[in-house]
Amino acid sequence: AALDGDRRIFLTAQKDIMTDDPDFNDLYKLGVVATVSHVAKLPVDGEMIVRVSVKGMYRARLNGIVSTEPHLVGAIRACAIRKYDIENEYGQALIRSAKSIFEGYAQSAPQLSPDIVLSVLGFDHPGDMADFIAGNIALELPDRQSVLEELDPIKRLEKLRDEQGRYMVDE
């Protein structure tokens, strides 16, 4: 359906992947509105797998389900994100700290592309940095969701920095 119109889709996680037919209560309420940028059908082990590439646009809250056939259609509302002052000294120190922790994480995670590491080092906004890192490191779903649900960019990067440090210790 997203491919027939403006290619926008609301993405949210299911709380329990074992639930075959999720309803409103089985879904996390905060997700992302994204644009579908590419769809590829690939043969894998004799089956066709659909791989979809998306670009996140903004956070949104799922307020309800308006239709279940042929797929779930939700009523959503965009979330207001707190503004960030780029001159904020604490924010800049937090970014430096997160970059340092990420570099350490990257050294222990050889599967990370050097391009991802370079991208992280180029960020100067805590919210954007947190979103990018969260999308590129191995986090458990509840931890990833917790980062997504934090709308304050400073608090989001603090939360991710703490999670990232915990995962480095656990690995």
Each PLM stretch: what is its role?
Residues A1-E171:
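N-terminal low-complexity, acidic/polar interaction/targeting segments
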